[in-house]
């Protein structure tokens, strides 16, 4: 037992988006600095040849975009996080985009795998990129 900073934190999509917007802004939002630009860069840069992850966030798979947790249309610089309950949040610095998807994939119970099997998070993110292309 004990307390952990995962699988049990609750927030609104708006507040999650503000945290990710702060990261996109290099650690600052509304004129207030929370993290240095260097820290944001460290958290979001791939740091290993054997993992696609940064120190704090997931990244697309450079060798096979279909293997990662984001849409194949997402540019290489995106970073984000997927959660056990089906949530995800991604930052796209190239397009200055923050994408937040909050869900409860474990309803009615933990064996519900439809959200993952149907690639819902990636498909929604892909639809966003498709809409941006049409603009």
Named regions from a protein language model:
Residues 1-135:
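Catalytic loop of the DD-peptidase/beta-lactamase superfamily, centered on the K-T-G motif
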């Amino acid at each position: 037992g004990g307390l952990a900073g995962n699988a049990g934190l609750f927030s609104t999509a708006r507040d999650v988006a503000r945290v990710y917007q702060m990261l996109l802004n290099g650690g600052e939002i509304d004129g207030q600095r929370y993290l240095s630009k260097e820290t944001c860069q460290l958290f979001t840069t791939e740091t290993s040849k054997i993992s696609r992850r940064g120190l704090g966030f997931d990244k697309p798979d450079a060798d096979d975009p279909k293997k990662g947790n984001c849409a194949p249309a997402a540019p290489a610089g995106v970073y984000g996080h997927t959660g056990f309950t089906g949530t995800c949040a991604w930052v796209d610095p190239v397009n200055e985009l923050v994408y937040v998807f909050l869900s409860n994939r474990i309803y009615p119970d933990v064996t519900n795998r439809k959200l993952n099997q149907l690639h819902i998070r990636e498909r929604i993110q892909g639809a966003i990129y498709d809409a941006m292309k049409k603009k």
